[in-house]
């Protein structure tokens, strides 16, 4: 029995070797030239298995992308390319609607250089100045539309259009305008405007329609003391009891000696 088993194993091994040898020598798997059946590991490592170049390789690569070729090798099903069907309603093209597309690039680029930062800061300053000018013009236009008017009522803070304007804009019902505040706190004396004086006849020209400056009618008294310029004396100024003592003329009886030094008063 043991002898029969060894013979069967030997026959199976021979059959397997013949099958492998026949498969290697078929036309689909030709043996490369210069390759013997008994090849060493070094010879198998240097074996050139590239084969001949395919003339249609570039054309195929140009038609099909790498993803499609890889999917074909891996057996992955690729979705069919969209192909428009026949036009509906005849050969006329459908009416297309315009669409706005955002073509702005939101990616962060390289940091700006020093010159670009200077230009950017200048542009930013000009933009802020333009915005401030526009805001000021808009505020002035709003003020003109609100029609602010200065008012002076008989009772400060009551029935005043200026106070009503400030109360409406600020939202505070107890606020007063500047004029009513000064009048209410007696900071200044306000009185009604007096009537204009009648025009006096002009004494310099024959035209009586134009007024002349008022005439001085009050004559000063004869004994009115007048200030007299007095030179500074080297001595100490004497004490006085009233202002009249300073403006009285002092009689100079002794001549001044200019050769002497001025005495210092302690």
From Swiss-Prot:
Lineage: Viruses, Varidnaviria, Bamfordvirae, Preplasmiviricota, Tectiliviricetes
Zn-finger (unnamed) residues: 160-180
Record localization: Host nucleus
Name of the protein in question: Early E1A protein
Gene Ontology CC: host cell nucleus
UniProt short sequence motif PXLXP motif, interaction with host ZMYND11, positions renumbered to this chain: 94-98
LXCXE motif, interaction with host RB1, short sequence motif: residues: 103-107
GO molecular function, one term: zinc ion binding
DNA-binding recorded as keyword: no
Pfam annotation, one family: Adeno_E1A
Subunit text: Interacts with host UBE2I; this interaction interferes with polySUMOylation. Interacts with host RB1; this interaction induces the aberrant dissociation of RB1-E2F1 complex thereby disrupting the activity of RB1 and activating E2F1-regulated genes. Interacts with host ATF7; the interaction enhances ATF7-mediated viral transactivation activity which requires the zinc binding domains of both proteins.
């Amino acid at each position: 029995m043991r002898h029969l088993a060894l013979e069967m194993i030997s026959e199976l091994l021979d059959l397997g070797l013949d099958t492998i040898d026949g498969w290697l020598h078929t036309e689909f798997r030709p043996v490369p030239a210069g390759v013997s059946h008994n090849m060493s590991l070094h010879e198998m490592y240097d074996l050139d298995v590239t084969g001949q170049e395919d003339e249609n390789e570039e054309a195929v690569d140009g038609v099909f992308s790498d993803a499609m070729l890889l999917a074909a090798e891996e057996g992955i099903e690729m979705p069919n390319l969209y192909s428009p069907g026949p036009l509906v309603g005849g050969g006329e093209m459908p009416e297309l609607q315009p669409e706005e597309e955002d073509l702005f690039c939101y990616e962060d680029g390289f940091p700006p250089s020093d010159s670009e930062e200077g230009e950017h800061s200048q542009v930013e300053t000009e933009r802020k100045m333009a915005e401030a000018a526009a805001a000021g013009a808009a505020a002035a236009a709003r003020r003109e539309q609100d029609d602010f008017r200065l008012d002076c009522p008989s009772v400060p803070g009551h029935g005043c259009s200026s106070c009503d304007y400030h109360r409406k804009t600020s939202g505070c019902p107890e606020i007063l305008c500047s004029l009513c505040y000064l009048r209410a706190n007696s900071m200044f004396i306000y009185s009604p405007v007096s009537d204009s004086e009648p025009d006096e006849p002009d004494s310099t020209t024959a035209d009586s329609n134009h007024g002349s400056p008022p005439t001085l009618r009050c004559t000063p008294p004869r004994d009115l003391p007048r200030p007299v310029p007095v030179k500074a004396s080297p001595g100490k100024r004497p004490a006085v009891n009233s202002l009249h003592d300073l403006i009285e003329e002092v009689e100079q009886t002794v001549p001044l000696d200019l050769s002497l030094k001025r005495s210092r008063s302690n």
